[in-house]
């Protein structure tokens, strides 16, 4: 199954769908069995202020919703999403390609706990994250790994996110 936009094909794997983001024709590939963005990601993209020429990093980008939205809502120079789950990162890359944002948005597969080794120190002006809300062993854990990773501190903690952000943010 695939959609078509400006001569580009959206490659959709079984179970995936193409959702209209209601912003300048942007669409996002999602798989409800893995993870779909919520209103919190949209609110975050409305809240973040990125100035012209600034570089932004989204830690734990999932399907890439935040850097994709920010690329249209702000005047930032470049947006990068870091995602540990290869399937989610690949889905995000396909959304970036489908929307023609390859020059503005990169999706990198990697571990948040190693972000300062993946990227140059003090390289980013803004860092966003929509972190897991629940501590690892608290609350009902979703049996789907992708959803559990997004909602619980399974692969990283808030401390990991803050530590790596301090290393990657420019001093201002």
Feature map (PLM): residue ranges:
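Mobile active-site "lid"/loop adjacent to the S-adenosyl-L-methionine
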Residues: 131-160, 164-170
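Conserved class I S-adenosyl-L-methionine
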Residues: 19-32
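Short, surface-exposed connector motifs at secondary-structure boundaries
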Residues: 75-78, 167-172
């Amino acid at each position: 199954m695939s959609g078509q936009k400006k001569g580009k094909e959206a490659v959709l794997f079984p179970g995936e769908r193409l959702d209209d983001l209601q912003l300048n024709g942007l669409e996002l590939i999602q798989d409800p069995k893995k993870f779909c963005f919520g209103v919190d990601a949209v609110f975050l993209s409305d809240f973040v202020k990125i100035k012209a020429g600034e570089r932004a990093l989204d830690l734990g980008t999932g399907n890439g919703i935040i850097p994709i939205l920010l690329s249209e809502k702000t005047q930032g120079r470049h947006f990068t999403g870091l995602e540990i789950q290869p399937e989610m990162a690949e889905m995000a890359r396909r959304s970036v390609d489908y929307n023609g944002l390859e020059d503005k948005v990169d999706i990198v597969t990697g571990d948040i706990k190693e972000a300062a080794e993946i990227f140059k120190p003090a390289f980013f002006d803004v860092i966003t994250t929509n972190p897991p809300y629940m501590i690892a062993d608290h609350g009902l854990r979703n049996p789907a790994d992708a959803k559990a990773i997004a909602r619980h501190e399974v692969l990283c903690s808030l401390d990991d996110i803050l530590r790596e952000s301090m290393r990657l943010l420019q001093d201002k």
